């Protein structure tokens, strides 16, 4: 809730008058991002998390949960698979169990396009999931399975949003600080007086660089709120999982050229 995407959702919810409580261990986030929004500092993957969360949900009259908490670096997930399962699946299990204990039956889940692995189609549809190629993507797919199981067991109402590549900032103080992502990485190298670096120029794409679907973080935040409203109003969604992207691909070189135009400087690229 205090991370890059979560903080945008929190701000939009509060702007429209919703009451919000954030649970975050602040290991990869910053409390300053959520201002005076009530914050409970907690790692949801710990043994005590279930009871703490269920008591909090009862005390705060929580009606819905938006679950962002997860480790999300693909390379790290390959190097530390059991830790990723403990963090992402263990945390998800604690949150769902706490919701059942507290009688909270609405969840919006931060899923990922990583559930598709390496698709053979140019445009992926929601029914093509099931072939992740790394532990991170596997944990997201399992998270969707867990919600479906809880729907069958105790009538959980849920929507999973499969993010593509998130970029931008709705407000300057909520910009993405994670230099593992393309745009912050390029800006960080420029700030340090280094050349931007392109890794891979022989992809089967028009300019040889990797192509990804990028979505602005405010559009993604709005998708969370729209999904939340569907569940709050008791409407039956057409699907449980939704791709959240633009459907348009942008290459690494196009991103760098765009940054050059915006900055007004033809910075060096390797």
Kindly give the residue locations of the regions a language model identified.
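Basic phosphate/pyrophosphate-binding loop/patch that engages nucleotide-derived ligands
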Residues: 100, 149-152, 182-191
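Short capping/connector residues at structural and topological boundaries
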Residues: 31, 79, 121, 129, ...
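Short, flexible, glycine-rich and Lys/Arg-enriched loop motifs at helix boundaries
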Residues: 31, 160, 165-182, 192-212
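Short, amphipathic alpha-helical "lid/cap" segments that border enzyme active or binding sites
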Residues: 50, 54, 183, 217-225
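Short-chain dehydrogenase/reductase
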Residues: 85, 133-141, 176-184, 213-214, ...
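N-terminal Rossmann-like NAD(P)+-binding domain of SDR-like oxidoreductases, especially those catalyzing
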Residues: 1-166
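C-terminal substrate-binding subdomain of Rossmann-fold SDR/epimerase-dehydratase oxidoreductases
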Residues: 190-270
């Amino acid at each position: 809730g205090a991370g890059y995407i979560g903080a945008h959702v929190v701000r939009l919810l509060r702007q429209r008058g919703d009451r919000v409580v954030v649970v975050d261990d602040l290991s990869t986030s910053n409390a300053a991002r959520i201002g005076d929004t009530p914050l409970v500092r907690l790692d949801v993957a710990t043994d005590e998390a279930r009871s703490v969360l269920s008591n909090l949900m009862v005390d705060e009259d929580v009606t819905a949960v938006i679950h962002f908490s997860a480790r999300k670096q693909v390379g790290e997930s390959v190097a530390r698979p059991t830790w990723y399962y403990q963090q992402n699946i263990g945390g998800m299990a604690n949150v769902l169990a706490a919701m059942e204990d507290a009688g909270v039956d609405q969840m919006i889940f931060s899923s990922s396009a990583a559930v598709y692995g390496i698709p053979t189609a140019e445009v992926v549809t929601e029914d093509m999931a099931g072939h992740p190629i790394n532990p991170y993507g596997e944990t997201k797919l399992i998270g969707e399975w867990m919600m479906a199981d809880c729907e069958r067991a105790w009538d959980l109402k849920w929507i999973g949003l499969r993010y593509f590549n998130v970029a931008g900032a709705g407000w300057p103080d909520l910009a993405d600080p994670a230099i593992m992502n393309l745009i912050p990485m390029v800006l960080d190298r420029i700030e340090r007086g280094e050349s931007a670096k392109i890794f891979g120029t022989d992809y089967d794409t028009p300019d040889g660089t990797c192509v990804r679907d990028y979505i602005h973080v405010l559009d993604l935040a709005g998708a969370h709120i729209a999904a939340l409203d569907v569940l709050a109003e008791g409407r039956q969604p057409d699907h449980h999982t939704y791709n959240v992207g633009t459907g348009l691909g942008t290459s690494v070189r196009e991103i760098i050229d765009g940054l050059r135009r915006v900055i007004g400087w033809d910075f060096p690229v390797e």
